[in-house]
């Protein structure tokens, strides 16, 4: 492979479906072969639009499960720059402030970039940049229970707010946008991020792409 080739893998699916776990597993196992500086993970959440011009009351009303809440154009631009051998400054998003913060995270070009996010497969421009894509096909009720536990413990949310958001936007947007995007996935993974066979298949695919 030439020095600027970059394999981009996307892992999509419902919130709390196991995307982060399978991404971390692949990252940890491949970096031993490639080197820590040659593989990176980009979370789609980092590209939620800046809402610093809105009040907190207005920010909490945003439908974060709709594609319009995300700046996919910026993500596409960053991926194109990385593929061409240039570093990018990835935004940092605060789940408690519901907007971007001043800090950014610099990413240098990588041999492998793993994208993870709920709406990655809904955007045709993003799909065109992917070398392989995965959809985590975890039952929605299991995802909800995981999300409830995670958001209360890690993101400063109340149980009531998580349940309300699930009813108003998370479940409806999953049915409208996320689940239909499954048709664009190359690999559909049942049973969540601990599916070892699916993880090995994806790793083999990445290694095959790198060998081209």
Curated annotation (Swiss-Prot):
Q: Which Pfam families does this one have?
A: PRK
Q: Which SUPFAM superfamilies match?
A: P-loop containing nucleoside triphosphate hydrolases
Transmembrane domains' residue ranges: none
This enzyme's EC code(s): 2.7.1.48
Compartment(s): Cytoplasm
Q: Which family does it belong to?
A: Belongs to the uridine kinase family.
Record's protein name = Uridine kinase
Native species of this protein? Shewanella baltica (strain OS185)
Organism lineage: Bacteria, Pseudomonadati, Pseudomonadota, Gammaproteobacteria, Alteromonadales
């Amino acid at each position: 492979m030439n020095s600027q080739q970059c394999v981009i893998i996307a892992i999509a699916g419902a919130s709390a479906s196991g995307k982060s776990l399978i991404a971390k597993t692949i990252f940890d196992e491949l970096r031993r072969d490639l080197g820590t500086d040659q593989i990176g993970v980009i979370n789609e959440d980092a590209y939620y639009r800046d809402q610093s011009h809105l009040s907190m009351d207005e920010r909490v009303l945003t439908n974060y499960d709709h594609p319009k809440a995300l700046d996919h154009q910026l993500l596409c631009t960053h991926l194109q720059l990385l593929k061409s051998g240039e570093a990018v400054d990835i935004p940092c998003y605060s789940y408690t402030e519901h907007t971007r913060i001043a800090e950014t995270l610099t990413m240098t070009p990588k041999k492998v970039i793993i994208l993870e996010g709920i709406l990655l497969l809904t955007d045709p421009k993003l799909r065109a940049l992917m070398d392989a894509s995965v959809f985590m096909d975890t039952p929605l009720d299991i995802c909800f229970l995981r999300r409830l536990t995670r958001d209360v413990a890690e993101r400063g949310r109340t149980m009531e707010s998580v349940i309300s958001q699930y009813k108003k936007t998370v479940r409806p947007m999953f049915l409208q946008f996320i689940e239909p995007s499954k048709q664009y996935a190359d690999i559909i993974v049942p049973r969540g991020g601990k599916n070892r066979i699916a993880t090995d298949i994806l790793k083999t695919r990445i290694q095959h792409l790198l060998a081209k």
